[in-house]
């Protein structure tokens, strides 16, 4: 006899982070690093990083160096990102692999990060809308209006303002352990009223909050092990 059992399961979703032109650079770097590296295989680690083009040299170049050399993350990027790091490769640093169109639609759940430079918040929102569904959306900004617009317009299960995507979880919200993150918008049975036609989007406002333990560079761990030996 065949029995059918209903199940509740996690579905595919991409997590994005956007770094605005008005931002606290050290805090934003920590948020991005924590969002990707704290547990790279997790569903709420970021897959795509969008950076406002004006922040390429003051923010992005140093961040990519850290991702490649300190944390051993594979970085793939848009042509502008590849060009930026191509100049760095000439000085002895590792290079960035060009991203394909398919890469912007991938949920990696691995130590891989796709990076794209965007002109402004408009382009960032358009990219996220065109490469979904979006599981977690992070914005790093010091601009209140940009934070509010991003939170309002991005279609994601959760928006983290100046906080790590890794905090998008039951225990991150103080609700206790969860079994997954759901992207479905309609889960109702029986009479359908206004309440059944609405769904929730979590918005968390932070000031650089991270999920602990915060990642330690592999080079630092290697040095500690050598010292102990």
Identify the residue ranges that each predicted region occupies.
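ALDH superfamily catalytic-core signature
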Residues: 1-110, 161
């Amino acid at each position: 006899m065949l029995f059918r059992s209903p199940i509740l399961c996690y579905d595919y979703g991409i997590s994005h982070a956007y770094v605005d032109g008005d931002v606290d650079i050290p805090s934003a770097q920590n948020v991005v690093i924590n969002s990707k590296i704290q547990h790279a295989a997790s569903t709420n680690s970021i897959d795509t990083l969008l950076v406002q083009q004006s922040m390429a040299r003051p923010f992005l170049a140093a961040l990519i160096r850290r991702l490649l050399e300190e944390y051993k993350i594979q970085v793939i990027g848009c042509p502008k990102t590849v060009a930026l790091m191509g100049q760095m490769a000439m000085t002895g640093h590792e290079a960035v692999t060009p991203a394909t169109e398919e890469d912007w639609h991938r949920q990696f759940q691995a130590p891989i990060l796709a990076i794209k430079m965007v002109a402004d918040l408009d382009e960032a929102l358009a990219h996220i809308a065109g490469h979904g569904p979006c599981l977690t959306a992070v914005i790093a900004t010091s601009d209140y209006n940009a934070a509010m617009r991003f939170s309002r317009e991005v279609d994601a299960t959760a928006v983290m303002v100046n906080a790590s995507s890794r905090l998008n979880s039951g225990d991150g919200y103080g609700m206790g352990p969860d079994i997954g993150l759901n992207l479905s918008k309609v889960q109702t049975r029986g009479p359908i009223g206004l309440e059944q036609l609405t769904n929730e989007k979590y918005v968390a406002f932070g000031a650089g909050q991270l999920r602990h333990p915060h990642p330690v560079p592999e080079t630092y761990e290697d040095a500690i092990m050598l010292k102990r030996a």
